[in-house]
């Protein structure tokens, strides 16, 4: 038995899941699944949630946050500060809208790519509306330009416990090169 749901007109749907209101773009598979099933990478999320609480983590860095599903879901952990990084302006704009509507004070957003240098880079996406872009999939005709910087240039922390979620489409090595100081 398969269930099908079709959306017409306004692709953005608002839905409250576990006390957080999300604005989901049903043209995109992850958003659609989260809208219908109310979960996304639950196994990984539950591990992150448990480890953050168990280790009294001070900062959660959501590198490649997209529209912030991890940041939003973890925002209820007391005393946790969240830094969400994404190079795609539409993703950050949507995340900021959800931060505002949910009155969240512990999430700070950064509209930048992270790597081993400072400058500008071109990201390629399969569709114009997709939240996922890549530096390396140049066969896609849709693109956007973003600034790029080292994590070490953007935030400073001493003797704090960090939890990093890094999902940046094969650019992880370059991210790590730009995060040497913060990871010491």
Ranges and model annotations:
Residues 1-184:
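Phosphate/nucleotide-binding beta-alpha loop and adjacent structural elements of enzyme active sites
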